[in-house]
């Protein structure tokens, strides 16, 4: 694949690429780049917030590059101070190792196990002696550390910052030195730490890595970043029915962000759906169902997911059980589409004698008496599109008609 096409794929959903020219140069010099993303195993499960980075690693993997999933089993015991207003509680070695095992099992739901290197930073960090730590510490200064927003705020507020927290970015940065990475990616909250790795590579006489930052996925609540501790997360090992239920709960505005970061749907197609919803040509629930399915299919089989979706709909639409088994079904002929490719539903229903007239159909809609499945029809100009099925109901317990267009 040519370099510009690779850059387009790599850039999708990213915030920073430092720098694009350097990345192009690396791609020109060697076919296979060393890519890494580090994950501190501070919680037992991976969720869709982690998946944003895993998906980008998969993009690199599909482009033929060498991908390393770095488990920060050593740095997890220090605790990342990023975004914290106070010193974090340290995890025990046992807790970290247990979480690491879980991460390692779950990551292969996304990455190709044959093409993925699982690396632990304790392999080099635990071998460093005090002299090595002093040499590493000499490569950076306190003034630079205080450029970090969270450190700066705590320092100005007179809140304590432990020396071990200053060491965290250095230890994380040293991972890039030890692994000789060409590209490191992480969330936007990790930008400072990623740039420290780039600086340290130069200090140790190595070629500086490119830095790629990705947005922090907003959680189900629509306001805070996805986090297990906040309860606004979707775990990548959740059952299909639970995953579908959670994804259907997100706001209509949030789903466009999920489409871009969590699926491979081309950006122009995402924009088409957005425009279709704005024009009321597409129903938000229909689009959200498609989004959920696209995400779920990356973790479970499509048939299993479809079964789960139908089961969820039955549970959450108890009225749908009242649909008669012998509901009348009509396949629309070409004559219905002779004058327009998308005839109005009320016109079709009047032609099929389901309602007395178009005007009666409009009156029913205004009165809230015409439904598609369990959803009230609110648009008098609701169009019928080819290749779809519509279950129409008149009144809460009225007659049904299934239209196949």
UniProtKB/Swiss-Prot annotation:
One Pfam family here: tRNA-synt_1b
Protein name: Tyrosine--tRNA ligase
Domain (S4 RNA-binding): residue spans on this chain: 342-404
Family annotation (Gene3D superfamilies): HUPs (3.40.50.620), RNA-binding S4 domain (3.10.290.10), Tyrosyl-Transfer RNA Synthetase (1.10.240.10)
Organism: Leptospira interrogans serogroup Icterohaemorrhagiae serovar Lai (strain 56601)
CDD domains in the cross-refs: TyrRS_core (cd00805)
Example GO BP: tyrosyl-tRNA aminoacylation
Subunit structure: Homodimer.
Motif 'HIGH' region location, chain numbering: 41-50
């Amino acid at each position: 694949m040519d370099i510009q096409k690779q850059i387009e794929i790599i850039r999708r959903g990213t915030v920073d690429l430092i720098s694009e020219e350097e990345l192009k140069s690396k791609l020109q010099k060697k076919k296979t780049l060393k890519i890494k993303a580090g994950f501190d195993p501070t919680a037992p499960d991976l969720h869709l917030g982690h998946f944003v980075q895993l998906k980008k690693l998969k993009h690199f993997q599909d482009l033929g590059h060498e991908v390393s999933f770095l488990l920060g089993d050593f740095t997890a015991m220090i605790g990342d101070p990023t975004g914290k207003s106070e010193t974090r509680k340290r995890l025990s070695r046992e807790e970290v190792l247990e979480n690491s095992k879980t991460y390692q099992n779950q990551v292969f739901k996304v990455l190709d196990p044959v093409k993925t290197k699982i690396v632990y930073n304790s392999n080099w960090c635990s071998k460093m002696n005090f002299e090595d730590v002093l040499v590493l510490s000499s490569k950076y200064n306190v003034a630079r550390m205080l450029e970090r927003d969270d450190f700066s705020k705590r320092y100005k507020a007179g809140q304590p910052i432990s020396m071990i927290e200053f060491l965290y970015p250095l230890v994380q940065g040293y991972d890039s030195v030890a692994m000789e990475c060409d590209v490191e990616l992480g969330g936007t909250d990790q930008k400072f730490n990623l740039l420290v790795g780039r600086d340290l590579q130069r200090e140790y006489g190595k070629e500086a890595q490119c830095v790629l930052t990705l947005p922090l996925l907003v959680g189900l609540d629509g306001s805070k970043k996805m986090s297990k501790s906040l309860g606004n997360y979707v775990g990548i090992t959740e059952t299909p029915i639970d995953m579908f239920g959670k994804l259907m709960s997100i706001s209509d505005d949030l789903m466009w962000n999920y489409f871009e970061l969590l699926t491979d749907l081309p950006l122009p197609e995402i924009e088409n759906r957005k425009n279709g919803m704005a024009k009321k040509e597409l129903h938000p629930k229909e689009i959200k169902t498609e989004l959920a399915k696209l995400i779920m299919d990356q973790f479970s089989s499509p048939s299993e997911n479809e079964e789960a979706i139908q089961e969820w709909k039955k549970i959450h639409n108890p009225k749908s059980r009242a649909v008669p088994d012998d509901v009348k079904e009509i396949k629309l002929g070409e004559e219905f589409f002779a004058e327009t490719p998308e005839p109005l539903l009320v016109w079709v229903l009047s032609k099929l004698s389901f309602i007395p007239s178009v005007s009666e159909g409009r009156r029913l809609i205004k009165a809230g008496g015409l439904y598609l499945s369990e959803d009230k029809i609110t648009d008098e100009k609701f169009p019928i599109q080819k290749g779809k099925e519509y279950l129409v109901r008149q009144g809460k317990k009225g007659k049904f008609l299934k239209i196949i267009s």
